[in-house]
Amino acid sequence: MNTLLATVITGLITDENKDFYFIQKDGFTFALSKSEGEHHIGEMVKGFAYTDMQQKARLTTKETFATRDHYGWGTVTEVRKDLGVFLDTGLPDKQVVVSLDVLPELKELWPKKGDRLYVFLDVDKKDRLWALPADPEVFQRMATPAYNNMQNQNWPAIVYRLKLSGTFVYLPENNMLGFIHPSERYSEPRLGQVLDARVIGFREVDRTLNLSLKPRSFEMLENDAQMILTYLESNGGFMTLNDKSSPEEIKATFGISKGQFKKALGGLMKAKKIKQDQLGTELL
C-alpha cells in the first residue's frame, strides 16, 4: 500500500519524457504532467500524490479541494447506481468515488450531477482513492453561530444530513447551519442538493437557523394564479369554476383553499387575464 497517496509530498525529479516528469519519493514514482509547468531533472517538486483513472501514480501541483487530512468540496459529475457517485475534487484525470455504502439507502435521495459534497479522501489496500462525506460534527465545528436578525432572508443551502426529523443544511455564503422541518418543504431534498432556503426562525439553543423551502404568502398567490392560468390554457380557455364554487370543488381541482382561489382569481382579473360570470371563468 502506498501511504503517500492522497497527501501532499515533496519529491525529486529523476527522469522525464515528452509528456511527464517522473518524481521519486520513498521508493515510489509519480508522474507530473508537463502541462502544469516547466521543471528540470534534479529539482524538488511539491504536489499532491494520487492515482488517476487508469490507477497510475500521479502528482499534481494544482490546488486540490480535499486530501486525507483536509476536508473540501467536491462536485458530482456522474452517478452510477451500482457503485456510487463520482466527484470532481480538482484532480487532473481523476474523479473520486463516494461509495454507495455511505450514501442514503433510498437512491432517490442520492446526489445528482452538479450537487456538492464536503469530503475527505481515503485509500484502500489496492491504492484506490475514495471520498468520504464529512460527519455532522465536522460541520458543527466549522460553522459560525447564526444571528437573530436574518428573518425572511434567502440563502443558498447545501444538504449535508438527512433525518426523519428533517433536513440539515450548510449555508456556504455565511458559514452557518440550518434546519428544514418536513412541514417546510414539499418533498425531501437530496444529499448534496443546493437549495434556495428562506430564514423563518432562529434556534437560540444552538444558534442555527430554521429554514423553509416554501414560498412567501405573496409568492404563493402568484403560484396559485399561474396554476389557474395553466389549467385554463390546457382546457380550451374555460372552466366551470368561479368564486361562487364550493370549497370542495376547488380543492379537488387545484388542491388549494377557496380563499386562496378567490385571491388568485382577483389578481388575474386585475391583470386582465380572465373574466368571470355565472357559468364559470374564461381566459381573455
Residue ranges and their predicted role:
Residues 1-284:
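Single-stranded RNA-binding regions, centering on S1/OB-family and related RNA-binding modules
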